[in-house]
Swiss-Prot record:
Cellular component aspect of the GO annotation: motile cilium; outer dynein arm
Record family assignment: Belongs to the DNAAF19/PR46b family.
Protein name: Dynein axonemal assembly factor 19
InterPro entries per record: CC103 (IPR042422), Dynein_attach_N (IPR031733), RPAP3-like_C (IPR025986)
Entry keywords, A to Z: Cell projection, Cilium, Cilium biogenesis/degradation, Coiled coil, Cytoplasm, Flagellum
Function: Dynein-attachment factor required for cilia motility.
Pfam family, one: RPAP3_C
Subunit details: Homodimer.
Residues making up the signal peptide according to the UniProt record: none
Gene behind this protein: dnaaf19
Coiled coil: 8-32
Organism: Xenopus tropicalis
GO annotation, biological process: axonemal dynein complex assembly
Amino acid sequence: MDDLETLDFRELERELANALAADQKYSRENDAKFRAIHQKVASYEEFRDIVLASNLKPLERKDKVGGESKQPWNPSFNTTNCTQKSEDVMLKKSLSDPTNAFEFARDWRRLGNVEKYDFLLQLGAEKLSQLFHAEVCSGLLGEFLLVLSESFQAIHVEKVLKILQTLAETKRFDLNLIFISRSEVESSQKLFGKLQTCVGAMKDEKRGLGDENLRKLMACYKISC
């Protein structure tokens, strides 16, 4: 009984630490965004670099610059097959249900584009709304549009529309939309082109509602008809 209580306490402590880290990361990135805007950066890439740099840990006196490192460039290179299998199992478990934006971003970075598409559909609009109740940063927003465009399947049209609607309702959406890259803008245009085709092929009773929702979404995402 004592061991169980200790284990529960440690799990609670871990979740609290993760939530605190996520809040701190959000605060740093948010400050960096406004700093970049005030600096009037010349490009999206420069804006993104400033936001990403907000999470870098500064060097300390004991850190050596240019010195020989004893740690290999790829620490996981020598892991055994058994360890790799164990990590794969842990990854699948962790992908099942992230509890906050920090855990989502951690899992997201481990996936390929097709897996990312499946991950978004698996979570669905309601779960994404819970994870990103604060905002979806421009980096993730652009990646979402890119992934949805590249892997889109007609059978998922309603799920994708709901996901896009959820993203459009997040805080500072208009600001984050401004800073997505040119390639991500093009992907967004292609995605909505595919959605238009799918909605146009719907039966009459669904097409009217689908057309109306799609027009509103296109206006939100600054897509011209």
